[in-house]
Amino acid sequence: MKNTIMRNWIVAIVVIAVVAALVVLSGLFRASSVAPQAQQTLSPERMQALIPRGRELALAGDCFGCHSMPQGPMGAGGLAIATPFGTLYSTNITPDKQYGIGNYTRADFHRVMRDGIAPGERNLYPAMPFVFSHITTPDDIDALYAYNMSIPAMPIANKSNTGVFVLPVRPFMDFWTLLNFPDRKVLRNDQRSAEWNRGAYLVEGLAHCGSCHSPRNFMMGVEFSRSLQGGEVDGVVVPDITAAALAKRGFDVPTLSTYLATGMAPQGTSFDSMYTVTHFSTSAMEPEDVKAVAIYLLTGKDGKLALPAASPVPLPQAAVPKNGTPMAAGRLAYMASCAGCHGMEGEGIPNVSPAMKGNAALAMDNPQTIINVVLNGTPTQVFKNGERMYAMPPFAHRLNAPEVADLVTWIRAEWGGQTVPVTVEQVSAQETAVK
């Protein structure tokens, strides 16, 4: 009798588990958040009127920074996005009917932006930041739709993904969304300024700052409980951009606005993936939107703007290093390999190389960013204010790991106020991570 009861319980549990799995895989639990009016077609006149607004929103969302190859046709896709599970390639989002989104209806586009589901019930991978665009208002999604449908159609085929993404894993994204796609709402605080609320809408939505600047879990889901506290992309650390962290690196609303609008500020210049953001997105945004983003990011939980910290004071052991110490070796390496461009006093050279003095990257607790720059260099960069920075050569084959560790330790102590020395193991790990 007991065995029969136990067997019945086991069968019941198995049946429930199978049914639950089928429900998840079929997406039955996922109620669409698309507004009912999206089922109606927009008139040609309305579409035309929405295009300018849509362009502004597309710039804020940096849509074409991901959906375009460098020097390639706008929106034609093909940009590689590395993940621990394989490489994804951004897709063609031009109105081409064969390879792009030319056959998307208004409702189709809304569902992509709000639910992360493409026509044919095709689950999108989270490289498409639908967990952020989910909060975008229906009117703004309409404007984006109108603009995307107005750009030149590019008959360019989409590239095939690699790794696990070649397998039929899209249905399993329903499991992913169950755990990693919270029903987020537009942040609205009537006790805060209109600028703060506008900045919150952009940062937490279309601009998807937290997509890179927040930690991710083992499933690559954004950890919203640690939003904007820093992340990692392609083995390179992405800095914490909470109010306290930005203020510690010397930013205030004017300097952060300048950085976003030009890619340059007293705290340094944008580079790597952030250069793409400032060059193609934030530098083209309306100035009032840029300021709103800066105000939101620099406002603490108490509702007050964080005050910028004073410039770091050089550590005594860096200013006057003792002979034979790693600090002395680091200073010597800087003078031999870096001072010619960055200056004996770290002052930099306008239109050639950024200053080390006051550089926010040196004030970061994690040295990965500077290690990566020393090892791999940076390309020539042209900024929207007309200035440029010339290419920095890689030093991976000129300096060994101990020399890089000493160099980075010294510049962080001299201009970043950092007391913790960089280890050979940290350099070696970064050499491996970026290969």
Specify the residue positions occupied by each region the protein language model found.
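Glycine-rich, acidic and aromatic/proline-enriched surface loops and short helix-turn segments
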Residues: 115-118, 262-266, 376
